[in-house]
Amino acid sequence: MENLDFTALENSLQRLGKVVEIYKKNPQDTIVRDSLIQRFEFTYSITLKTLRKYFIERAFIVDDVNKLSFNEMVRTAMQLNLLKSDLAKWTEFREMRNLISHTYDENVALKVSGIVPDFYEEITYLLKELKGIK
């Protein structure tokens, strides 16, 4: 079985972690907040792609994986003990990602930036679990 390549997720997580630390020190800096949100967006996307690849690599049927809804994918990852948080928290991450991707609004940006540190911790946990199983 071929090993999964986690490089994209590792790199995006590292970049997100750097801006999370900067943002914690200066949350009023809109340039830093914008960077935080953008890095959240692409790390979120890479995370979902990585989970799908993981499921396929671990002998799930490709067509079945491609048909998984978001909720089913999160539940499957939870059953495999890959996630720290529950479906409700992952739904919040998804909602924040969807809100910010359609329009830019100051209040939405503040709301999204508020959950990014939790997201960072979650993806750090996920990556450790994925690499531990690799």
Cite the ranges covered by each PLM segment:
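Solvent-exposed interaction patches of small proteins and small membrane subunits
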Residues: 1-134
